[in-house]
Amino acid sequence: MDPDRQADIAALDCTLTTVERVLDVEGLRSRIEKLEHEASDPHLWDDQTRAQRVTSELSHTQGELRRVEELRRRLDDLPVLYELAAEEAGAAAADAVAEADAELKSLRADIEATEVRTLLSGEYDEREALVTIRSGAGGVDAADWAEMLMRMYIRWAEQHKYPVEVFDTSYAEEAGIKSATFAVHAPFAYGTLSVEQGTHRLVRISPFDNQSRRQTSFAEVEVLPVVETTDHIDIPEGDVRVDVYRSSGPGGQSVNTTDSAVRLTHIPSGIVVTCQNEKSQLQNKIAAMRVLQAKLLERKRLEERAELDALKADGGSSWGNQMRSYVLHPYQMVKDLRTEYEVGNPAAVLDGDLDGFLEAGIRWRNRRNDD
């Protein structure tokens, strides 16, 4: 094996060893053993919320351990591939070296992707995520764009086998949604998806324009950590106004004959939260309270860091505040304006192929925090 390839393998070994240490491989095995014990409890599904959390974390942790173990196996096998290639002659030798080089390139990409997980060390990074999408400038196209984004994130979660719980969907009159709030129930979902926060811009030929003109639309994505019982977010009963109404579907159609939908208004802050996707008023109230607690936790966190005013100044779904651009016409390109990461296949991205953008965003955030 030539010195350059030896150096590449040694560098990958160093990176993977660091990843194994940070992820605590033995700790992962112990955690899996504990979760498997919980999952075997015959009464686990008596509490569906707990059951969902346990099974989701177990699946995630098992996948994480399998990923690291597989990377180590592949890295250990790589020198053997080059040794076997050296025993070949002529065209067979060239083919064997090319095969080993392809594995080296693939392994480097996979180790670097796994390394990104070690960068999720923020205070709330290991939490589940609460995602809110709001349509911005662009009329019916913006409402349709907001719904496309919602589908994109749900497809991403489904591809990773992460459960999604939709709390509220406010439909627009003609098409699309005004807003939606949903939770992604997976460890580190917040740390991963928080880089998606900001304004997303779509450029396309409008399907709602009789003259088929090009339209620019905006939608805003907000990502919060799901509140846990240890967060101590106390909300006095008198600080919250509760309004009930009938759930509505696309076009404003009523989908429920009872007043099961709930709107909570936090009077001191003016924060308004709605929930209409559960079957009963009580379930909707509980779900809405979870969302309100998450928003108040984020508000408290930002105030403690003296960032609230700066973030408000940066807010709004408009041209000047976009973080990613999705162009479907006159060319096809999705480009993150912070990281410069781009993909020429918008259809794949909108179908949930987001990992490249998420990894680039996490690395970008980590570099920013180090500066």
Swiss-Prot record:
It is found in: Cytoplasm. Its main location: cytoplasm. Keywords: Cytoplasm, Methylation, Protein biosynthesis. One of its GO terms (cellular component) is cytoplasm. InterPro entries: PCRF, Pep_chain_release_fac_I, Pep_chain_release_fac_I_sf, PrfB. Disulfide bonds: none annotated. Methylated by PrmC. Methylation increases the termination efficiency of RF2. PROSITE patterns: RF_PROK_I. The modification N5-methylglutamine is found at residue 253. Pfam families: PCRF, RF-1. SMART domains: PCRF (SM00937). GO terms for molecular function: translation release factor activity, codon specific. The keyword Iron does not apply. Transmembrane segments: none annotated. Peptide chain release factor 2 directs the termination of translation in response to the peptide chain termination codons UGA and UAA. Belongs to the prokaryotic/mitochondrial release factor family. PANTHER family: CLASS I PEPTIDE CHAIN RELEASE FACTOR, PEPTIDE CHAIN RELEASE FACTOR 2. Was identified as a high-confidence drug target. This is Peptide chain release factor 2. It comes from Mycobacterium tuberculosis (strain ATCC 25618 / H37Rv). The lineage of its organism: Bacteria, Bacillati, Actinomycetota, Actinomycetes, Mycobacteriales. The gene is prfB.
